[in-house]
Swiss-Prot record:
Gene Ontology terms describing biological process: adenine salvage; AMP salvage; purine ribonucleoside salvage
Protein keywords: Cytoplasm, Glycosyltransferase, Purine salvage, Transferase
The organism of origin for this protein: Haemophilus influenzae (strain PittEE)
EC supergroup of this enzyme: transferase
Quaternary data: Homodimer.
Gene behind this protein: apt
Homology family: Belongs to the purine/pyrimidine phosphoribosyltransferase family.
GO CC annotations on file: cytosol
Name of the protein in its database record: Adenine phosphoribosyltransferase
GO MF entry, a single one: adenine phosphoribosyltransferase activity
Keyword check for Transferase: yes
Length: 180
């Protein structure tokens, strides 16, 4: 019998040498083409966080929106966006972070988080953890806390889970893929 996790993992295509030589791209768009796999993804994340005292769900640009919004809806919680610069219409707060070659910046609305909010961050994939670390810093600057982050995919050898654990963030991942 196929488990929900088997269904999810088998629905994710691995594309070798994309976007560049030596990279194996994990394509979640194929998971979205299998309604039972997409539903299982949302259901498993919702079940994990139903009784954790979460007050807001954040999705990181852009595939975190795909999974974060339905999770927030199922939990009956507000959903907030973390985006690249100049994509949000109201006043924002920004956080820069280092990439392998350069720097990037994330933004969110200044009124997205209230003092004392217990925030769940959702993204499709955990690699180095840089995006989520920057998101944690944004939340903290606005007075919230992040104890939990959920991912569809983890690439364990890239160290993101350890990096986030060192920040006090517990990571929940549905499937691990070796190789990147």
């Amino acid at each position: 019998m196929t488990t929900q996790l088997d269904l999810i993992k088998s629905s994710i295509k691995s594309i070798p040498n994309y976007p560049k030589e030596g990279i194996i791209f994990r394509d979640i768009t194929t998971l979205l083409e299998v309604p039972a796999a997409f539903k299982a993804t949302i259901d498993l994340i919702v079940e994990q966080y139903r009784d954790k005292g979460i007050t807001k769900v954040l999705g990181t640009e852009s595939r975190g929106f795909i999974f974060g919004a339905p999770v927030a809806l199922a939990l009956g919680l507000p959903f907030e966006l973390v985006r690249k610069p100049k994509k949000l219409p109201r006043e924002t707060i920004s956080q820069s972070y280092q990439l392998e070659y350069g720097q990037d910046t994330l933004e969110m609305h200044v009124d997205a988080i209230s003092e004392g909010d217990n925030v769940l961050i959702i993204d499709d994939l955990l690699a180095t953890g840089g995006t989520v670390e920057a998101t944690v810093k944004l939340v903290q600057r606005l007075g919230g806390t992040v104890k939990h982050a959920a991912f569809v995919i983890n690439l364990p050898e890239l160290g993101g889970e350890k990096r986030l654990n060192n920040l006090g963030v517990d990571c929940y991942t549905l499937v691990n893929f070796e190789g990147h």
